[in-house]
Amino acid sequence: GVYEIIQGEPYPLNQENCVGCRICLEMCPNRAIEVNAIPQDAREAWGFPDVVEIVRKAQSASYKIRSTGALRKIPDFDDLVVIPAQVSRPPIDKYREPCGTDVVLGDRYAENPLKLDTPVMIGAMSFGALSKEAKMALAIGSSLAGTVTNTGEGGMLPEERELADKLIAQYASGRFGVSADYLKQGDAVEIKIGQGAKSGMGGEKVTAEVSRIRKIPVGSDALSPARHMDIVGPEDLSMKISQLREITDWKVPIIVKFASGKVASDVKIAAKGGADIIV
């Protein structure tokens, strides 16, 4: 164990055996024990924050509503690497030559392709998962940065559409808030096949306003099927792209979004199916 009894007193002589269970903390009659995490300890399958959360759940019989995603450090702007030019084209002298970051996406079929000043798109996060204020802030930020933001699968807030210079209307498996008018309001339509993270049910977050935007009952569990029920193969994806293109009168690009998996095969299918943009 962690402790050994010496002359009737417990001493933590084997601290390397501690798994963060916190039983000693609960059993100590004098509340004299404090359990602290070891930041450099990488041996545990369940980290210290995980154990603390498990204990909290056991005590409260409920889970904490919080953001989800990987706990590891994610890349930021300092991690962006621009592929250097060497022989194929002369390097740019940054002191004398301008460097453009503007890009045009989806000009093969769409009458109004996406034109971005900054080629870093804001990921899809829906209203309900984010507050109205957060969605409005992303819309304002995307406009200031000259890029595009995304409705996510929770429908489109009128304020979001008003504040975002460019806004992608997501078409996900749950089809929350989806209509022809919704699709036509977007500067692009994104068919979400997969994504990097997925939270749980979240029915307690379906307020009256979320209900109105998503067009589902208040307090209901907003469940999204694991896949689009009408997209089961390559031909179905091609038909869906064509359908959305017709609904939007060929005016905006059609995007297909995948999670990381069999990337080469999936991208090939989406490109053959007529996708304007693949993310």
Placement of each model-derived feature along the sequence:
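Iron-sulfur cluster-binding cysteine motifs and their immediate structural context
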Residues: G1-Y11, I23-D41
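Short strand-loop junctions, especially beta-strand C-caps/beta-turns
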Residues: G8, M125-F127, A259
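Residue-level marker of alpha-helix boundaries and capping positions
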Residues: P12-Q15, G128-A129, I231, K257
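Short pre-active-site segment immediately N-terminal to redox-active cysteine/selenocysteine motifs
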Residues: E16-N17, M27
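Conserved, well-structured core domains of diverse proteins
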Residues: R31-A32, N36-V120, A124-A164, A169, ...
